[in-house]
């Protein structure tokens, strides 16, 4: 059961990293469109908006590390839930 939990956590970590990387690339493409639109049609605080749309610092390595962090937290939650008292003892009923 432990091996299955670890395998599922690692699988979902890589799946999350792939989806996050695709989403960030899509957002970066959209951000370049918005930045070019802001240059042609200036708005108040346009530079602030353009700077907030920068996804250049987020690399696939960062998304992979974030996904691994999610997997570790999910495993920690699963292990802490599985080591708690059985349901019958926690509610005060006797377990046969």
Swiss-Prot record:
Q: Which organism is it from?
A: Dictyostelium discoideum (Social amoeba)
Which GO CC annotations does the UniProt entry carry?
A: membrane
**Keyword Transmembrane helix annotated:** yes
Membrane topology listed for this record: Single-pass type I membrane protein
Name of the molecule in the record: Uncharacterized transmembrane protein DDB_G0286141
Residues of the signal peptide: 1-30
Q: Which residues lie on this side of the membrane: Cytoplasmic?
A: 76-96
Q: Which residues lie on this side of the membrane: Extracellular?
A: 31-54
Look up keyword Transmembrane helix and say if it applies: yes
